[in-house]
């Protein structure tokens, strides 16, 4: 993801005292001062995961063994994140997850050396369900199409549980192959299924193709059970919204952050504008939520090293567990000790009817406060185990 890669170049500059400092200006922790980390200049190496767990593992292993990487970060799939996190645990390296939204990353597959700033499937369901019930009513029948992998399953489960708790009924849930590009055979049965809502537990190209197919089949214009037929996309990204074009207009989903957040929702989300300014001046366009979470993770790692006074992974773990911070664009945030999951507000968004440009595709509908998306860390199983300090 070029956007995420771009976002990693920025904190390296800011940590080394170059550029305008970005969110170092607004971050509640003042340990970092632009002289690197513990006086050492920050350098980085990159590798392509190919959205493939084996390729990602090989790339991360090479960075650790050949390049001497002491922290690995990134990835844009939960399968990749879980694989690389496990490798880092075994190697005694800290893993700061990038764009991964499956419950498993900080649930059944959590590791002491791994940390996630991005939100998860459970939080999406908890944030989205009340809005869906409010806008579409409690008497709805949902049909799920679910990408056949880790993230798809936890997202379907989360959205099903949270909507059923508010009165919705799930009439069908059908798995779709990750490699699927033509979804017409999956969309065709929906209208005669008794459902009046289609929920697309799809990400990236899957979502672009399935949503386009659903709209071409006339689902958005259809009636079912005496109601307007609706489509929901639980997790939005800018690239997906752009790829699906006008088909996203009016469709609800969630995101972890948006570049307009501070301007639309106020100073609680300070740090947003500082980051948008830094990123925009360097790259000529506003950052995505993927860029944001990656930038935050790099600074949070650096700050934890600085506060703990050591690059030892166990010192970093100690500094991050239970760390409360602010000024990084999400409002007050907790890095929870029990599962290494950041607990913060979640945005409910929908596609704009008349976007001004490719970066203005989503509008903020509501913000679900952190308290309302908080869950018992034990519910997803797993065990952090002990930190591995490495060599």
Task: Please give the residue ranges for each predicted region.
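Short beta->alpha junction loops
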Residues: 31, 36, 45-53, 146, ...
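Extracytoplasmic "Venus flytrap"
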Residues: 1-17, 48-53, 76-77, 145-153, ...
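Extracellular/periplasmic periplasmic-binding protein-like sensory domains
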Residues: 111, 214-295, 309-311, 362-390
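Solvent-exposed, acidic/polar segments of extracytosolic/periplasmic ligand-binding ectodomains
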Residues: 249, 324-391
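Signal peptide-proximal N-terminal region
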Residues: 6-44, 165-167
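Short, charged, surface-exposed loops that flank catalytic or proteolytic processing sites
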Residues: 306-318
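Short, well-structured alpha-helical segments in soluble
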Residues: 46, 50-70, 130-135, 182-194, ...
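Extracytoplasmic ligand/sensor domains, especially the bilobed periplasmic-binding protein
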Residues: 6, 17, 66-174, 181, ...
């Amino acid at each position: 993801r070029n956007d995420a890669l771009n976002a990693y170049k920025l904190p390296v500059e800011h940590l080394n005292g170059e550029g305008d400092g970005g969110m170092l200006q607004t971050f509640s922790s003042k340990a970092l001062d632009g002289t690197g980390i513990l006086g050492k200049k920050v350098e980085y190496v990159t590798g392509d995961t190919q959205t493939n767990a084996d390729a990602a593992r090989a790339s991360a292993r090479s960075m650790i063994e050949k390049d001497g990487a002491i922290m690995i970060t990134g990835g844009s799939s939960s399968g990749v994140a879980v694989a690389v996190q496990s490798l880092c645990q075994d190697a005694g390296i800290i893993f700061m997850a990038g764009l991964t939204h499956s419950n498993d990353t900080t649930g059944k597959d959590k590791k002491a050396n791994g940390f996630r700033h991005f939100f998860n499937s459970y939080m999406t369901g908890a944030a989205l369900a009340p809005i869906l019930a409010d806008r579409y009513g409690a008497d709805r029948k949902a049909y799920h199409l679910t990408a056949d992998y880790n993230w798809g399953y936890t997202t379907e489960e989360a959205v099903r549980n949270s909507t059923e708790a508010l009165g919705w009924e799930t009439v069908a849930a059908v798995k779709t192959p990750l490699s699927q590009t033509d979804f017409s055979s999956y969309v065709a049965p929906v209208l005669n299924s008794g459902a009046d809502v289609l929920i697309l537990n799809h990400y990236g190209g899957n979502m672009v193709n399935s949503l386009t197919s659903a709209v071409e089949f006339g689902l958005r214009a259809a009636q079912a059970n005496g109601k307007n037929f609706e489509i929901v996309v639980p997790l939005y990204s800018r690239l997906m919204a752009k790829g699906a074009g006008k088909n996203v207009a009016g469709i609800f989903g969630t995101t972890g952050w948006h570049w307009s957040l501070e301007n639309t929702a106020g100073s609680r989300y300070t740090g947003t504008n500082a980051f948008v300014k830094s990123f925009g001046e360097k790259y000529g366009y506003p950052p995505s939520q993927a860029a944001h979470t990656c930038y935050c993770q790099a600074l949070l790692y650096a700050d934890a090293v600085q506060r703990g006074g050591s690059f030892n992974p166990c010192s970093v773990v100690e500094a991050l567990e239970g760390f409360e911070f602010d000024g990084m664009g999400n409002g007050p945030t907790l890095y929870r000790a029990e599962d290494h999951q950041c607990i913060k507000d979640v945005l409910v968004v929908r596609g704009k009817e008349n976007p001004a440009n490719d970066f203005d595709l989503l509008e903020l509908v509501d913000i679900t406060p952190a308290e309302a998306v908080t869950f018992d860390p034990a519910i997803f199983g797993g065990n952090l185990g002990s930190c591995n300090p490495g060599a």
